[in-house]
Amino acid sequence: IPHLCHSGKKGYRSDGNCRACMVEIDGERTLAASCIRTPTPDMVVKTESHRAKSARKMVMELLVTDQPSNEKAHDKSSHLWDMANLEDVSESRFPELEIERIPLLDDSHVAMNVNLDACIQCNLCVRACREVQVNDVIGLAGRGHDAKIVFDMDDPMGESSCVACGECVQACPTGALMPASNVDASQIGDSMDFDREVKSVCPFCGVGCQISLKIKDDKVKWVDGIDGPANENRLCVKGRFGFDYIDHDHRLTKPLIRRDGAPKGLNVNPEDPSSHFREASWEEALTFAANGLRGRGREVAGFGSAKCTNEEAYLFQKFIRQGFGHNNVDHCTRLCHASSVAALMENVGSAAVTATFNEIENSDVAIVIGANPTENHPVAATYFKQFSKRGGKLIVMDPRGQALKRHSSHMLQFRPGADVSMLNAIMHV
C-alpha cells in the first residue's frame, strides 16, 4: 500500500492527510485511510479491490501533477517517486499548476534548500519540527489552494529561528526539503547518489547518536540519523551538517616542521602556512618530535580531551606514564565531574548514570540542573521537550535563563553559587 504522510518511525503519529493509502472495508460506504484506521475484530479490509486501487492511483496522479518531472526532480529517488512507480504513475492527465503560482526557491539557509514546488503538504516536516524535535519553527499557513509550509511568520528559512537539526529534511518524502550538499545549481538531486554507506556514531558529544554517512568519491556527501537507542533517528545541527571540516582546505594533510627562526604563536595564515612551516616526511617529523620530547621528564604534563575515544585516552595516559616516567596526566572530565562521581558512588553505588535520558518517558517529574541540553546535547533535549509537551512536570534549575525554560513548568533561576544551599533546602522540605 503506498503511503506518503505516514512515517512509521518513532515519534511520528499517523496523520492520514495524503490519502495515498486508501483501502476498502466491508460494510462501509467510504474508503478509509489505512494509516489512521484502527483494526477491530472481524473487520474485513480489501487492499486490492478495484475501487481501492483506482482511488490510490488517482491520488498519486493528482500528487504528481504539480511535481517537477522525475528527470528534473529535486530528489530523483524520493519516496514519492517510489510510490508513484509502485502505482505505475509517471505522468498526470490533469492540468499543471499555473507558472505564477509555483513557489520560488528558498536557498537562504547555508545547509538546506527549500523547494516548495515539490511539496505535497503531507505535514511530515511539521510533525518532525513540532512533535519530534519540538522546535516549533515549521507550520502550515493559508487556506485551501493557498495553504503552504512556512517558517515562523513566513520568513525565509535562513532568517527564521530554525536550529538546523535537519529532521524535516530527513522526513520529507518528495525532495521539497533537501541538504544543500545534495542538489546542484539547478536544484536537481538524488538521495541515492552515493557510492557507499558507512554507519558510525556521531563524534561530537556524549549522547551517542548513530549516524549513516553517505560517501561519494571518498567524501562525505550528507549524513542521516539512524534508529539507535540514544537518538531514534534524530540528529542535531552538528551531527547532521558538521562534517565539512573533514575535507576543508585548512586541514593538514602533510607533516609540517616550523622553520628555523619562525616566531611561535597563532598568527599563522591558514591559507599559506609555508611562511612559518615547511613540509616534511612522516619519518623526519616523528624523529623531530621525539628528539624534542626526549629527556624532558616532568617538564611535560598531559591533559586529555573528552573528545577522544576510550582507546585514545588509554594510549595517551600510557604515553605520559611510560614515555615520561611520571603520573602527571589528567583529563578535563575529572575536573567537572569529580564531585558528582563522589556523590553518585555514595548514594547509588555507581559513578555512571543509572538510566538513559529517554527513560524520562516513564516519569512524572524531571529536574534538570547543572546542564544546558538544548545547547550542549540537543538530541537529549528533544526527549525533555517531548516529556513537557505530553504534560510531564519539567523543573529547570539554572542561574542562566537557558532555552529549556520555555518548555518547563517551573524555572528556578538561582544566584550563581547558591545551588548547594538550594538543594539542601529542598532536601529538608
Model-found features: residue ranges?
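N-terminal export/assembly segments and adjacent metallocofactor-ligating motifs
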Residues: 24-27, 43-428
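N-terminal cofactor/phosphate-binding cores enriched in small/glycine residues
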Residues: 1-41, 54-55
